[in-house]
């Protein structure tokens, strides 16, 4: 695809950035992220309304990640000759449809179907987002355009959980998803108005993506990515029941905790470039080690609200290094195949999200309230050890 993009650039001679299109892509990304994480802050009322346990309701996150995993790997190959403009419009339609199906769900099955639609949009869009952005601006402006996309991600992560918690208490969880559907409609119209025709990849450009895993240190890196994100979702998916029952937070208190978590994540993302300049490998090993210690502290002393709030802030600040750090690892260690490596990374992250949320939910329902924390801490510790021992890092 990278060769095709280069050819296309030469043919189209992009001289001026299409900022309206870039911002439409960023807005779509933000909406996808917000809707992906809405169940985290609405888990309890969703479970009560549908007559299921919170652990089962958490599988609405699992199915989204599971479908997104396959979408990220195969959608770009399936639609390689299709104009990307129409594909992005389709993803925005799926986002809107997902929100409506969830808001009108009267059964767990319909809820899962709605969340599966989101998974298709999420995985497919993420697999294409970088290459889309590169085709909307001149080469010199690509870093700035990508910063707009990832800035939208950071903002979405800041507001998703606390906004969902606040609005869920105010208007009910179903109306929260109805409001999200309105955002989806705005995505559709903005994309139709601003995104130009972007021809798909010719069939002769097709290459074997998975061959990258044979390179030294790449498989270890992907396993480390899997464990770190599985550990994150084993904890974060169930932050509402853990914090409300372990630390005794009410809805208002939980909203403030989630807001603090989001702000800390935004700050961590903003500071990550300075930390990664010093040592990417140290960041990739040190961040999960800090998170493992944080999980232990929350398990032992989480009944104290100050401790619980502090852990949430530290967690948000520290985990922000993880996705940025692994993206930096890919651009340095797999620079010649960064797009294909990115597709594998998205699939690994979504598989990790699936497994983390699923096993965390099982542990919550069958072992105990703090079991998702212990699972998360163990995975983070293993990640730190694996990065230290096996992950290779090329110098910039």
UniProtKB/Swiss-Prot annotation:
CDD domains cross-referenced by the UniProt entry: MFS_NepI_like
Activation/inhibition comment: Reducing the electrochemical proton gradient across the plasma membrane by the addition of the protonophore carbonyl cyanide m-chlorophenylhydrazone (CCCP) leads to a drastic reduction in the rate of inosine excretion.
Substitution effect: residue 158 to M: In strain: BEN2908 / O2:K1:H5 / APEC
TM segment ranges: 22-42, 55-75, 86-106, 108-128, 148-168, 176-196, 216-236, 256-276, 282-302, 306-326, 344-364, 367-387
GO cellular component: plasma membrane
Pfam families cross-referenced by the UniProt entry: MFS_1
Subcellular location: Cell inner membrane
Periplasmic side: 43-54, 107, 169-175, 237-255, 303-305, 365-366
Knockout or disruption consequences: Inactivation of the gene leads to increased susceptibility to purine ribonucleosides.
Gene Ontology terms for molecular function: antiporter activity; purine nucleoside transmembrane transporter activity; transmembrane transporter activity
Stored NCBIfam families: PRK10213.1
Stored PANTHER family: PURINE EFFLUX PUMP PBUE, PURINE RIBONUCLEOSIDE EFFLUX PUMP NEPI
Function according to Swiss-Prot or TrEMBL: Involved in the efflux of purine ribonucleosides, such as inosine and guanosine. Adenosine may also be a substrate. Confers resistance to the hypoxanthine analog 6-mercaptopurine, however the level of resistance is rather low.
Protein name stated in the entry: Purine ribonucleoside efflux pump NepI
């Amino acid at each position: 695809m990278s060769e095709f993009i280069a050819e296309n650039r030469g043919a189209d001679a992009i001289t001026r950035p299409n900022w309206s299109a870039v911002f439409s892509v960023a807005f779509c990304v933000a909406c996808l992220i917000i809707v992906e994480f809405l169940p985290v802050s609405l888990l309890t009322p969703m479970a009560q309304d549908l007559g299921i346990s919170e652990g089962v309701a958490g599988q609405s996150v699992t199915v989204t990640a599971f479908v997104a995993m396959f979408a990220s790997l195969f959608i770009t190959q399936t639609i390689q000759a299709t104009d990307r403009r129409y594909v992005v419009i389709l993803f925005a339609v799926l986002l809107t449809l997902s929100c409506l199906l969830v808001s009108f769900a009267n059964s767990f099955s319909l809820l899962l179907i709605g969340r599966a639609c989101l998974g298709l949009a999420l995985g497919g869009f993420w697999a294409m987002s970088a290459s889309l952005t590169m085709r909307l601006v001149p080469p010199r402006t690509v870093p700035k355009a990508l910063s707009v996309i990832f800035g939208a991600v950071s903002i979405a992560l800041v507001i998703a959980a606390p906004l969902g918690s606040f609005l869920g208490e105010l208007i009910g969880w179903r109306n929260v998803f109805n409001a999200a559907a309105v955002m989806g409609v705005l995505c559709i119209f903005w994309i139709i108005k601003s995104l130009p025709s972007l021809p798909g990849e010719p069939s002769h450009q097709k290459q074997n993506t998975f061959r990258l895993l044979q390179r030294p240190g790449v498989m270890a890196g992907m396993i480390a990515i899997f464990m770190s994100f599985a550990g994150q979702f084993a904890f974060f998916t169930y932050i509402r029941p853990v914090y409300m029952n372990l630390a005794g937070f009410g809805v208002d208190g939980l909203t403030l905790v989630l807001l603090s978590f989001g702000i800390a994540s935004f700050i961590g993302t903003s500071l990550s470039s300075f930390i990664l300049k010093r040592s990417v490998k140290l960041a990739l090993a040190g961040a999960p080690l800090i998170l493992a210690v944080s999980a232990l502290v929350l398990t032992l002393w989480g009944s104290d609200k100050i401790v619980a709030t502090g852990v949430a802030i530290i967690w948000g600040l520290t985990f922000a290094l993880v996705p940025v750090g692994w993206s930096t690892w890919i651009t340095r260690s797999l620079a010649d195949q960064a797009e294909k490596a990115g597709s594998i990374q998205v699939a690994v992250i979504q598989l990790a999200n699936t497994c983390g949320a699923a096993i965390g939910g099982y542990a919550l329902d069958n072992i105990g309230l703090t079991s998702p924390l212990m699972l998360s801490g163990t995975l983070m510790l293993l990640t730190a050890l694996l990065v230290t021992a096996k992950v290779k890092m090329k110098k910039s």
